[in-house]
A protein has these predicted regions:
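Class I SAM-dependent transferase core
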Residues: 51-53, 64, 77-116, 129-131
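S-adenosylmethionine/decaboxylated-SAM
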Residues: 112-115, 121-289
Length: 289
């Protein structure tokens, strides 16, 4: 029934409803019930979330196992773990991702006072900062926290002499509201289905990094991966977020490359954490661009 109602509402109405996140008390009580958090046993957690937290379906939190993610990325890229760990620490102190984002969202009811990039955001930041890609492609935008993270990493790269850009696809008009205006000059957002929209969005360019956060559907993700592989740069890294991870595993087996699944350990949050799959589907033999 819930999925049927969502379909009837349409993307625009759903986006407007999400803007009332802090006021959706009944919905949030249901979220806690699904995660077995009860008022009588965990009153502080229950009340804090229901009364104050705006997030009802996509959660943000600090991670307790960033070191594990860094180890996965070091194994995938061949780059020193110390270098990747230093890039991971940049996220916590970056002006745009901390105070800048807080200033822009202070009047919004659907955004936390401090947003912490989660597993796939952090993985994307580290790969962009370390690899300095010319082109990143993202399928699935929603409010655009991942887009913001990638664009800020690209901006820092450009300031260091290594420019790049982001191409994103989402079916929802108005997606990406968290992205600051000054970061949009290196961003192209297509309102299109990623399964069919990637070829036109990428054109003759080559993809260095692909982030799939669209639908938890294996056939959908497989179509995205096939489109990206046809336009892959000599070195292509892929991050697949949540849901069915079968598609990336299937491609990995076909290409004979390893696919690693990272499971988040959230700090101080009732959500048990997401799973992301990471792989290097093309490799020209160099660990750095």
């Amino acid at each position: 029934m819930k999925q049927q109602l969502k379909a009837l509402m349409g993307e625009g109405a759903r986006r407007r409803l999400r803007r009332l996140g802090r006021l959706r008390w009944i919905t949030k009580a249901g979220v806690l019930r699904r995660h077995e958090v009860r008022l009588r046993t965990s009153p502080a957690t229950w009340l804090r979330y229901v009364l104050l937290d705006p997030e009802v379906d996509t959660f943000t939190y600090r991670l307790d196992n960033v070191d594990e993610l860094v180890a996965v990325l070091a194994a995938q890229t061949g780059l020193p773990a110390a270098q990747l760990a230093a890039h991971a620490r940049e996220v916590e102190t970056d002006e745009e991702l901390t105070r800048g984002l807080a200033r822009r969202t202070r009047r919004r009811l659907d955004v936390k006072r401090r947003l912490h990039p989660v597993g796939h955001h952090l993985a994307a930041w580290v790969l962009v900062r370390a690899r300095r890609p010319a082109l990143v492609v993202e399928a699935g935008v929603l409010d655009g926290l991942a887009s913001l993270v990638v664009l800020r990493a690209l901006e820092r790269n450009a300031q260091e002499g290594a420019p790049g850009r982001l191409v994103s696809l989402d079916v929802m008009p108005g997606a990406g509201s968290l992205v600051a205006p000054h970061l949009r000059e290196r961003w192209t957002l297509h309102v299109a289905d990623s399964r069919t929209g990637i070829p036109a969005a990428v054109g003759e360019e080559r993809v260095d990094l692909f982030v799939s956060d669209s639908l938890p559907d294996s056939a959908h993700v497989r179509a995205e991966l096939d489109a990206v592989l046809a336009r892959a740069a000599p070195t292509l890294d892929v991050i697949q977020v949540w849901g069915q991870l079968d598609a990336l595993h299937d491609v990995g087996r076909e290409l004979g490359v390893p696919v690693t699944v990272f499971r988040e350990r959230p700090r101080g949050h009732f959500y048990p954490g997401n799973r992301i799959a990471l792989a290097r589907l093309r490799d020209d033999g160099r660990s750095a661009p």
